[in-house]
Amino acid sequence: MIRQSLMKTVWANSSRFSLQSKSGLVKYAKNRSFHAARNLLEDKKVILQKVAPTTGVVAKQSFFKRTGKFTLKALLYSALAGTAYVSYSLYREANPSTQVPQSDTFPNGSKRKTLVILGSGWGSVSLLKNLDTTLYNVVVVSPRNYFLFTPLLPSTPVGTIELKSIVEPVRTIARRSHGEVHYYEAEAYDVDPENKTIKVKSSAKNNDYDLDLKYDYLVVGVGAQPNTFGTPGVYEYSSFLKEISDAQEIRLKIMSSIEKAASLSPKDPERARLLSFVVVGGGPTGVEFAAELRDYVDQDLRKWMPELSKEIKVTLVEALPNILNMFDKYLVDYAQDLFKEEKIDLRLKTMVKKVDATTITAKTGDGDIENIPYGVLVWATGNAPREVSKNLMTKLEEQDSRRGLLIDNKLQLLGAKGSIFAIGDCTFHPGLFPTAQVAHQEGEYLAQYFKKAYKIDQLNWKMTHAKDDSEVARLKNQIVKTQSQIEDFKYNHKGALAYIGSDKAIADLAVGEAKYRLAGSFTFLFWKSAYLAMCLSFRNRVLVAMDWAKVYFLGRDSSI
């Protein structure tokens, strides 16, 4: 019985041994005593040394080791996939496909209408990107030959973002469309709604020309100019923050003031004036620039000029009782409390009455007159119509507002009989604010509008060539049905974002019926992610991300 038990034990473990070692153990068990065989089986050294090398048995890995290997592989594959996606996206943007050329007629003989777009801002570019440009002869007229990503413009004067990272050439945008687009680097200065013509003047250097352009449809998206509210001295002594040239000018003034102040004695009152930076306007542009300026002083200038950086004063002047009035009160209070912590001097209920070369004269909420000395003054408040918009207003009776071009619910210019549309900051309509988000959605809406307008034009052409009354009736029904599908423009507010300094941001979000209020460092990451996603091209996203990484590791570039 004992020997049989031993044999069963040997055979039960025989899978662990090779054939030779198996037969050897059986023979050994038959010829030796039970105790000797048992001792052999219990001798771990013999089993490990003589049997293990021939078995191929692998020890089971721990859960954490297996998980670690899987995670490492997943990260590696993700990095490879991400690199491939980035490379492909950049290649696709740099190598556009062949475009359909412009022509006077379509293959069926119907007329191809001309659509002229004035401007290269948010509304105009949104229309151009979403429009099927094969349906019209599309012409873009703008004195600025690039699109500017304005939400990140306040980051550029102090070097957080480089200007080249937030611009995209108009010709590049136009070249990526399916149909050919003509572009004129020129400024429209007169529109004739009666004869449907536009007078433009070249803004290109060494290439002056005047040109008359005919249109069937005209979209005015020329934006707005800064509104000084008639305050004396603003145009002469302050800097605005709407264009690349404005950011470059502010950067030059900041660096010049700092260098001049460094050459003066700390007790000199002129030094204190030069180191006083004043921002007028408590909207997103003014708030974000003040925050960026404070960050530059605290995070960069303090390293290289520690004593001087302590003397720099940032002041934000706002005529209303609060800054960022489009945000929820909780977020407004959060931003104002943070500004106090950052030592940004908030002057609320303070209205600027006059500006001279060194001082702002302002009226406080108590009615007192206060003089605020400054070294650099940035005016970031209010919009006013441009000259071409003012000119157009005088030619249409219905245009009786000074705040902007009046439009209906389909973005058609009042009094223009359906041939002129207006979008963006150059317009005025109750409930629509002069923001990039509004202009972007207006551009998307018009792209769909013109798609349906093309369909109606084609149905009308077919109706004029119909052979019998039944076909005419059928086409009329289709026209009525298509016209009924053109809905009014409805703005979908998705929320508002603002950077408030010290790597913190606020977000007032609307998702369906729900509303969310976010504030803090996590919101700053969301702010970055949202603006990266909103960048016009993949190239812009890469450059902006690299700028942020550069600031994190190397600091801001303060050179001019």
UniProtKB/Swiss-Prot annotation:
Source organism, top-level taxon: Eukaryota
Transit peptide endpoints, chain numbering: 1-41
InterPro entries, per database record: FAD/NAD-bd_sf, FAD/NAD-binding_dom, NDH-2, NDH2-like_C
Sorted UniProt keywords: FAD, Flavoprotein, Mitochondrion, NAD, Oxidoreductase, Transit peptide, Ubiquinone
Gene Ontology molecular function: NADH dehydrogenase activity; NADH:ubiquinone reductase (non-electrogenic) activity; oxidoreductase activity
Pfam families attached to this UniProt entry: NDH2_C, Pyr_redox_2
Residues binding FAD: 114-144
Catalytic activity: a quinone + NADH + H(+) = a quinol + NAD(+); a ubiquinone + NADH + H(+) = a ubiquinol + NAD(+)
Gene Ontology biological-process annotations: glycolytic fermentation to ethanol; regulation of apoptotic process
Record has Mitochondrion as a keyword: yes
Similarity comment text for this entry: Belongs to the NADH dehydrogenase family.
Role played: External NADH dehydrogenase required for optimum cellular growth with a number of nonfermentable carbon sources, including ethanol. With NDE2, performes the mitochondrial oxidation of cytosolic NADH under these growth conditions. Regulates the mitochondrial glycerol-3-phosphate dehydrogenase, GUT2, also involved in cytosolic NADH oxidation.
Name of the protein this chain belongs to: External NADH-ubiquinone oxidoreductase 1, mitochondrial
Species for this entry: Saccharomyces cerevisiae (strain ATCC 204508 / S288c)
Gene from which the chain derives: NDE1
